[in-house]
Amino acid sequence: MAEPTNPFPQLPHAAPFLLLDRVLDVGERSGVFLKLVSAADPCVGRDGRLPAAFVLEALAQGGGALLAALRGGEATPGYLAAVDDFRMLGEVRVGDQLRVEVEMLRNFGGAVLFHARALVEGEVRAEGRITLKSPR
């Protein structure tokens, strides 16, 4: 059996923890990505919901993918350093197409602040500010 292809080689994540499936758009300060929520996804609970922690991780991966794209696709190790005003506003369930939108607010050198939100069918299901930090 062939290994699944990584659509985001610039992220250090591998299946099953690579949550994003597709790049929809990348601009100068923002990016839009897609996660297809499947019953086969090991992150999905027995109740068919994607837990808030994984929604937050998808937002962080969107920020990392945007940074890598802005750096010419260069993979840069980093981590989620801070989460502010994060709110879950609805459920994310099997069958949903989770749209991940990130907008870069400030770049502090080694740390970047984003406003991030997750939407399903145009409805915001989660949002907040996240900070990603790079060790270099």
Predicted features along the sequence, with ranges:
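Hydrophobic residues on conserved beta-strands that form the core of alpha/beta folds
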Residues: 20-21, 83, 113, 127
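Catalytic strand-loop segment that frames the active site of acyl-thioester-processing enzymes
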Residues: 15-51
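Hydrophobic beta-strand-centered segment that forms part of the acyl-chain substrate-binding groove
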Residues: 63-101
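Compact, glycine-rich, soluble single-domain proteins
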Residues: 46-67, 80-81
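HotDog/MaoC-like acyl-thioester-processing domains
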Residues: 32, 93-94, 103-136
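Short aromatic-glycine motifs in intrinsically disordered, low-complexity regions
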Residues: 2-14
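A residue-level detector for short acidic-glycine micro-motifs
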Residues: 22-25, 85, 90, 104-106, ...
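Hydrophobic core residues within well-ordered beta-strands of beta-rich domains
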Residues: 17-19, 98-99, 112
